[in-house]
Swiss-Prot record:
Lineage: Bacteria, Bacillati, Bacillota, Clostridia, Eubacteriales
CC per GO annotation: cytosol
GO biological process: response to hydroperoxide
InterPro entries: YaaA
Family, similarity comment: Belongs to the UPF0246 family.
Highest taxon in the source lineage: Bacteria
Record-linked NCBIfam families: PRK02101.1-3 (NF002542)
Pfam families in the cross-refs: H2O2_YaaD
Name of the protein this chain belongs to: UPF0246 protein CPE2152
Amino acid sequence: MIALLSPAKTLDLTKPNLNIETSKPIFISEAEVIMNNLKELEIQDLCPLMKISEDLGVQTFTKIQDWNTIYYGDEKPFVLSFKGEAYRGLDADDFTKEDLEFCNDSLRILSGLYGALKPLDGTKAYRLEMGTKISIDGSKNLYDFWGNKIMEAVLKDLENHKEKVIINLASNEYYKSIKKIDKKVRVITPVFKERKGIEYKVVTVYAKKARGQMVRYITKNRITKSEDIKNFDLDGYEFNERLSEGDTWVFTRD
């Protein structure tokens, strides 16, 4: 069983007091191709492409120009670097070495630049969303550039797991990069809803955090069987069998 999560736009590169070796992303060669294309762009090109302000464009331009493929094994792990709602829910800062190692086996972070990241892959500062409309070496966009590579990498990692199930906690933007995977293996998609009057509705900010909390729950409880995630109960959520349908598992809270 492997869970999938989207990356965050914000990165914190402050080194933690942690004695654990980081790894090099498996698609570093592909990332280099993408970055070489981005390095040719000026700030005035990046801002409309990435839909960012000029100030953020300057920062992004600097990150792109500074990016390289040199790894020393002491970089900050991506799972600790990403800072967004999902990663606030995951809250990996208090993970033990054993937690991080389990998470490294059971989670893959989808990425526009790196394809698929392991949690303990070393961080290089970057900003590139999967949905960015950029042509790389003749491809229509990043989805076209990556093709089936990300899916095949996840499936290969899944071979080492007893239960061949994907827990899809990624956003549609990122899951789209491997959407054909449900033809190969079972994909369970948890959905998190809040009570609003007499109905339950998805509230995006809470749903993002809950996705990270689900990864935390899987990690802390060493869950390897998908059925066990139905016991997820962080922050008042509980599995709602009535609203769930097929492999779309709904978790609600009042």
